[in-house]
Amino acid sequence: MKVGVYGASGRIGKLLLEELKGGYKGLELSSVFVRQKCETDFSSFSHAPLVTNDLKAFVKACECVVDFSLPKGVDHLLDVLLECPKILVSGTTGLEKETLEKMQKLALKAPLLHAHNMSIGIMMLNQLAFLTSLKLKDADIEIVETHHNLKKDAPSGTALSLYETCTKARGYDEKNALITHREGLRSKESIGIATLRGGDVAGKHTIGFYLEGEYIELSHTATNRSIFAKGALEVALWLKDKAAKKYEISEMFG
């Protein structure tokens, strides 16, 4: 399957190019979208991709777009994909409501998966968080996330997805249960997210379930960003030949 990388100059984008260098499990890098000159030398790649700043040409040259870009970039990408539908794997966080609505429209035309985190470990953490939230009904839930000092969105998309998992399990009001800045006493049906930024931390997420006299913490730490690139490519392989729909990463492993 021919893959196009959107957001190739970013941290994960560069790792995607490296993974696709020799062809990842039969995936071929066919196109790379760049707004400025690309730093990557493609002479050693098994196939020379189209490197372009023409978004339509980029999309037409591939069968699947793997996106790790910025929110505005995803919005522009979706405009083109709605005209020329292709499989979409997106790991970009902080998307606006209008962009998510465009994604839903694309799902009527092509298979896609949008996830805040593509790692297997986070998928398992979500499942454990749901089960623990359901079983420990009296536990207070708090989430702590830590990332590098250049991360733009806060809280992280992964922390918000974990929050959504816990609210669904508990039946909390998703819009009103979130606390990112706390003053005074803790309200019962609330879940706090604490955000830490520093150094070059790839990502750490911890969910605490606090009871009287004891507590449980579930934690995931990313020690190498390559897990996100490899995870995204595994998703691309899984989506091949799937029907048009917006899939959840839990379906892939469930």
From Swiss-Prot:
Pathway where this protein functions: Amino-acid biosynthesis; L-lysine biosynthesis via DAP pathway; (S)-tetrahydrodipicolinate from L-aspartate: step 4/4
GO biological process: diaminopimelate biosynthetic process; lysine biosynthetic process via diaminopimelate
Gene3D superfamilies assigned to the protein according to its UniProt record, in alphabetical order: Dihydrodipicolinate Reductase, domain 2, NAD(P)-binding Rossmann-like Domain
Location of the protein in the cell: Cytoplasm
PANTHER family: 4-HYDROXY-TETRAHYDRODIPICOLINATE REDUCTASE 1, CHLOROPLASTIC-RELATED, DIHYDRODIPICOLINATE REDUCTASE
Family assignment from sequence similarity: Belongs to the DapB family.
Name recorded for this polypeptide: 4-hydroxy-tetrahydrodipicolinate reductase
Organism: Helicobacter pylori (strain J99 / ATCC 700824)
